[in-house]
């Protein structure tokens, strides 16, 4: 059924469809009885899926990745869609319109998306008001980025301002320095630039702070960010963002679509490589959230056993439909029981022994 609906929706402009579907989801989950029924039906109910990560209780490991609900207008929706948590944003200290349209494209042969949205959002202040007025049934993290018009030498203050506004209201914060769609943003991943930003955010809030990195970083840069995160006492790392690589794409005409980051299966291999490298580097000293190309329960299981405590998806949700998160959670629960694991935590990094144990 969803395959037919998706085929029809894919005849329409991607960003228009996103707004339409998001509005339908919000409307369908607006009534409390309906929302509760959907949460019981679609949500992760098997206790083996639950875990406590950086002091926050997650009913299931799969969350909605940042980018879908940029302004937190669906805070009451995501539990009812079966997610164990949601990450909203990216929000910036000041409202901004993002890049000119068209800025979102489908790559159907690759089951992928290309976007150059550019952090379009209503600002951290507007999100803070929504967070204060709602009490979602699942944890909600907030992804913060740099305002486009803020010079790089003022980035610290920009991130600090966002952290001040949304930090007290979020389950966790993610410092996004890895989107390819804000000029110069990825340069902030260099440790000499990243250190003062992370230190400022940590000083501003007691909420757990993570950093989101790009799949296009070199291995040595991944190591440096990991070491910095441990040194500063971050809660974890989100790996990875979208890729600017166009290698191996099957969809014709991608070169004519212009700049942007690609999400979905094309980033899966590198995302898993980065996850494994991070786990070997930091072990359980940091929480690792894996995102990028997760489509099936087997994909999710590979990430968990490689060291991810939590997972995220966006493109998989677009191509998989409303039952996607339920299928992922059900598949993870099945693998946990089959493997004799008493909890999700026991399975995290369980395949690391085949590649050498991480430091403890």
Curated annotation (Swiss-Prot):
One of its GO terms (cellular component) is cytoplasm. It catalyses: (S)-dihydroorotate + a quinone = orotate + a quinol. One of its GO terms (biological process) is 'de novo' UMP biosynthetic process. CDD domains: DHOD_2_like. InterPro entries: Aldolase_TIM, DHO_dehydrogenase, Dihydroorotate_DH_2, Dihydroorotate_DH_cat, Dihydroorotate_DH_CS. Substrate binds at residues 70, 115-119, 176, 181, 241-242. Binds 1 FMN per subunit. It is found in: Cell membrane. Signal peptide: none annotated. The active site is at residue 179. Belongs to the dihydroorotate dehydrogenase family. Type 2 subfamily. Monomer. Catalyzes the conversion of dihydroorotate to orotate with quinone as electron acceptor. This is Dihydroorotate dehydrogenase (quinone). It comes from Mycobacterium ulcerans (strain Agy99). The gene is pyrD.
